[in-house]
Swiss-Prot record:
UniProt pathway annotation: Isoprenoid biosynthesis; isopentenyl diphosphate biosynthesis via DXP pathway; isopentenyl diphosphate from 1-deoxy-D-xylulose 5-phosphate: step 2/6
EC numbers for this chain: 2.7.7.60
GO term, biological process aspect, one: isopentenyl diphosphate biosynthetic process, methylerythritol 4-phosphate pathway
HAMAP family associated with the record: IspD
InterPro entries registered for this protein in UniProt: IspD (IPR001228), IspD/TarI (IPR034683), IspD/TarI_cytidylyltransf_bact (IPR050088), Nucleotide-diphossugar_trans (IPR029044)
Origin: domain of life: Bacteria
Site (Transition state stabilizer): 25, 32
The protein's name in its UniProt record: 2-C-methyl-D-erythritol 4-phosphate cytidylyltransferase
Keywords per UniProt: Isoprene biosynthesis, Nucleotidyltransferase, Transferase
A Pfam family per the record: IspD
Function of the molecule: Catalyzes the formation of 4-diphosphocytidyl-2-C-methyl-D-erythritol from CTP and 2-C-methyl-D-erythritol 4-phosphate (MEP).
Molecular functions per Gene Ontology: 2-C-methyl-D-erythritol 4-phosphate cytidylyltransferase activity
The family this protein is said to belong to: Belongs to the IspD/TarI cytidylyltransferase family. IspD subfamily.
Length: 241
């Protein structure tokens, strides 16, 4: 009797969360992703948004090699979650996660310290591949008047904001292409501030998908209070808003 062997389906979408940073600018005595925001940690909120999305098959978290807090999170044993050891810089952590991701999947790379992510923003990004097959990022048009200074802190000139955007996360690219381009950029000594900058360096120009203004990154102490206000509002409504 012959037997039919089936190959497990490779996930179409994986989320990558670089969480190996120490958050020095917060001066909080612990990595900022573990600071409490409402009922749980910042990282806990971030993981909840990703793990609960039905079109994300796996979430890969890159951790500091001496992280002793992650296993205390309720999400740590989730069946969709995988951890890897991250690197000294964000790009190194993303590279480590990409190396273990399915190479024919797409990766949503999301900051650990952006806890207010909604499913509606994820949905918009996932749906963007028809318009932007090269990949895309969540972003927000600049609203304020932008000034460029000189090196003494004096205004040099006003920048036209008409075509300026704030880059947010997630940033969404094919795993294999992002892995190749990010690795090549780092080997060339290029300073990589986000995944889109690695793709731009390689001659790939990502699309811009307008995201929510409350998808903020907790970087400074004041951000924690603001994120708390946003999270309180989101907690009263579903993530799909």
């Amino acid at each position: 009797m012959s037997m039919t062997h089936t190959t497990p389906l490779v996930p179409k979408n994986v989320a990558i969360v670089p969480a190996a940073g120490i958050g020095a600018r917060m001066a909080a005595g612990m990595p900022k992703q573990y600071l409490t925001l409402g009922a749980q940690s910042i990282l806990g909120h971030t993981l909840d948004a990703l793990l609960s999305h039905p079109q994300i098959a796996q979430v890969i978290v890159a951790l500091h090699p001496h992280d002793d807090m992650f296993l205390g999170l309720p999400q740590a044993k989730h069946s969709k979650l995988l951890t890897v050891i991250g690197g000294g810089e964000r790009a190194d952590s993303v590279l480590a996660a990409l190396a273990v991701a399915p190479q024919d999947a797409w990766a949503l790379v999301h900051d650990a310290a952006r806890p207010c992510l909604t499913h509606s923003d994820i949905d918009k990004l996932l749906a963007s591949t028809s318009e932007f097959p090269q990949g895309a990022i969540l972003a927000m048009p600049v609203r304020d008047t932008m000034k460029r200074s000189d090196d003494t802190g004096v205004i040099n000139h006003t920048v036209d904001r008409a075509l300026l955007w704030h880059a947010l996360t997630p940033q969404y690219f094919p795993v294999a292409e992002l892995l190749t381009n990010l690795s090549a950029a780092l080997n060339a000594g290029v300073v990589i501030t986000d995944e889109a900058s690695a793709m731009e360096w390689a001659g790939v120009f990502p699309g811009l998908v307008s995201g929510r203004a409350d998808n903020i990154k907790v970087t400074h102490p004041d951000d924690l209070h603001l994120a708390g206000l946003f999270m309180a509002h989101l907690s009263a409504k579903p993530l799909v808003e």
